[in-house]
């Protein structure tokens, strides 16, 4: 046990954590040369393409240290993106130490700070590493100072390395062995294991990635999940060296996998505790929480007969992604589809891309919304995540919107622009701190505004230098109204938005003029209107196409021409009564592009 080291790597996107993991695996001989590929631990195509890590992965490596002993290192790769912060906290609570990898040319970023604080709160030993020191732009001195100023851990003796060219890999492994403590735990106590991650395999069912805290587990044991109370029989246990290798048992302090013939991912929840039925543990490990969806959007198949295929596809994705929630929904404009809940915008994009790529679906996605809390006149509190489900305004006492606390790290030159942006988005400044060349701004922002386009705007006002991290704070009452879009006098439910009253008129005008460009011209005039309740606040008309009915009249009496024109007018009127308007996919995306002024 004293020779086991469990550690994970904390880093911002693109600071080189997956490459570093590759080097460790290569150095310790976890895979043979022919099996090496770039980003071994990122198993999904979409992870490799976007260069991000979504699911946690592990590698059990053997390392012969300079003191001649062989150490068993368990590397747990964590996702770095803010949407997946719960997965990060699970991965970290399974470790005793974490490598804080910082790009020596870019310095500290917001998500690094957030994940690092999570690690420190969980009592994990943080070891700083400066990566990419072979870049001409690298400034290791400045960056180590930055780590000390911003995060407050000693970084003078931070290991300097370059994962790409393989410099300093051995130094990092030595530091891991010396600085990170060995796991504490009792191999003879009742079994306690933390589920770090779980995914679905077509052959064996659900595979659970676990960290054993106490006790041991071997095949044929009966295990029990403490959050759900479900019981299963263990079929096999083992470790990943990234390849899966079966073992006869897993003991306290180790990280490995358990397969127990489970059919549904819902029963193996990330962060839950596994124990034995015969000798159950007294209490579960702390920190388990149900993942809450933050962002909602409607997904509809373009062809309505694809509805069943879409449901199958979502169910299959859910096998691998327990944080995806969905329920059936009917829209008058779009037919049958699903209302889906996501962790954040990146998660929404990834799910959409996987549906299109892996399942070949054609989808229409409505604008993302957040959950609102409504206090009704009769004193009940309900949650609404779909604008078209909002009850009649006369019944509502107040609407509360979710507020998030966001931490923005930005270079000094761009502070003004970023503060202006936050104020436009109805943000309230909480704190501002200068640290070296960076400034850390803390704002309370309405989540509704962040979902729309805040992230893109933040990147463009700061030329890509600002980085953002956020967490949910509370629900707060606010003056919100529902903005409806009407085409030809009929409400299009899929285009409804909940907006702040001060932005409503501007938003309505923008949206309507965008829609006018996107709806194809018909044989009759189409009125596109934006309304709040019964008040129309903006209107545009899509002009009719018309045939020149006078082309065949040469000369002749004016009454003849009038008769033809009147006949055409009457025909157009009749068409307008029966005509319905096809709204193209782009119109639904137009909502996303409507920004606040």
Curated annotation (Swiss-Prot):
Signal peptide: none
Keyword set, alphabetical order: Cell inner membrane, Cell membrane, GTP-binding, Hydrolase, Membrane, Nucleotide-binding, Protein biosynthesis
Entry superkingdom: Bacteria
The organism of origin for this protein: Laribacter hongkongensis (strain HLHK9)
Major localization listed first in the record, in broad terms: membrane
Protein biosynthesis is among the record's keywords: yes
Gene (name only): lepA
Catalytic activity reported: GTP + H2O = GDP + phosphate + H(+)
EC number: 3.6.5.n1
HAMAP family associated with the record: LepA
Binding site for GTP: 14-19, 131-134
Designated name of the protein: Elongation factor 4
Membrane-topology descriptor: Peripheral membrane protein
The protein's enzyme class: hydrolase
């Amino acid at each position: 046990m004293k020779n086991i080291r469990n550690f994970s790597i904390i880093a911002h996107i693109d600071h080189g954590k997956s490459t570093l993991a590759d080097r460790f695996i290569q150095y310790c001989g976890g895979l043979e040369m022919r099996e090496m590929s770039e980003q071994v631990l990122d198993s999904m195509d979409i992870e490799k393409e976007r260069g991000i890590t979504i699911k946690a992965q592990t590698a059990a490596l053997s390392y012969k240290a300079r003191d001649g002993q062989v150490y068993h290192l368990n590397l747990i790769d964590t996702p770095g993106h803010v949407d997946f912060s719960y997965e990060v906290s699970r991965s970290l609570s399974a470790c005793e130490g974490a490598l804080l990898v910082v790009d020596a040319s870019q310095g500290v970023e917001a998500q690094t700070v957030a994940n690092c604080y999570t690690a420190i709160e969980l009592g994990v030993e943080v070891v700083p590493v400066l990566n990419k020191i072979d870049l001409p732009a690298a400034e290791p001195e400045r960056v180590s100072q930055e780590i000390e100023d911003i995060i407050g851990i000693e970084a003078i003796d931070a290991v300097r390395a370059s994962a790409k060219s393989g410099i300093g890999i051995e130094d990092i492994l030595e530091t891991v062995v010396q600085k990170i403590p060995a796991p504490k735990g009792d191999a003879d106590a009742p079994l306690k294991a933390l589920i770090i991650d779980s995914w679905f395999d077509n052959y064996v069912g659900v595979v659970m990635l676990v960290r054993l805290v106490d006790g041991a587990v071997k095949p044929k044991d009966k295990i029990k999940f403490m959050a759900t109370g479900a019981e299963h029989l263990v079929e096999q246990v083992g470790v990943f060296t990234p390849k899966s290798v079966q073992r006869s048992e897993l003991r306290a302090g180790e990280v490995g996998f358990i397969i127990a013939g489970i059919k549904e991912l819902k029963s193996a929840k990330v962060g839950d505790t596994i124990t034995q039925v015969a000798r159950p543990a007294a209490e579960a490990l702390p920190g388990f929480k149900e993942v809450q969806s933050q962002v909602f959007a409607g997904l509809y198949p373009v062809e309505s007969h694809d509805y069943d295929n879409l449901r199958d596809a979502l169910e299959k994705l859910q096998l691998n992604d327990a944080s995806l929630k969905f329920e059936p929904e009917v829209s008058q404009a779009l037919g049958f589809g699903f209302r889906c809940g996501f962790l954040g915008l990146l998660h929404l994009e990834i799910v959409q891309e996987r549906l299109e790529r892996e399942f070949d679906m054609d989808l229409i996605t409505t604008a993302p919304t957040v959950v609102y809390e409504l206090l009704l006149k009769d004193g009940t509190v309900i949650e609404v995540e779909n604008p078209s489900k909002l009850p009649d305004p006369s019944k509502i006492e107040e609407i509360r919107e979710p507020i998030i606390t966001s931490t923005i790290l930005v270079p000094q030159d761009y502070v003004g622009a970023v503060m202006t942006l936050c104020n436009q988005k109805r943000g309230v400044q909480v704190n501002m701190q200068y640290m070296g060349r960076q400034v850390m701004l803390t704002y309370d922002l309405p989540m509704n505004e962040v979902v729309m386009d805040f992230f893109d705007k933040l990147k463009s006002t700061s030329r890509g230098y600002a980085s953002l991290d956020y967490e949910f704070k509370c629900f707060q009452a606010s003056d919100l109204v529902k903005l409806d879009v009407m085409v030809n006098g009929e409400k299009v439910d899929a285009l409804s938005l909940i907006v702040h009253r001060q932005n409503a008129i501007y938003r309505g005008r923008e949206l309507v003029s965008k829609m006018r460009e996107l709806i194809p011209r018909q044989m009759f005039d189409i009125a596109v209107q934006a309304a709040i309740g019964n008040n129309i606040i903006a209107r545009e008309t899509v002009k009719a196409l018309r045939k020149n009915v006078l082309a065949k009249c040469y000369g002749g009496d004016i009454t003849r021409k009038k008769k033809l024109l009147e006949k055409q007018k009457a025909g157009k009127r009749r068409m307008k009564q029966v005509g319905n308007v096809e709204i193209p996919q782009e119109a639904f995306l137009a909502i996303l592009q409507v920004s606040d002024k």
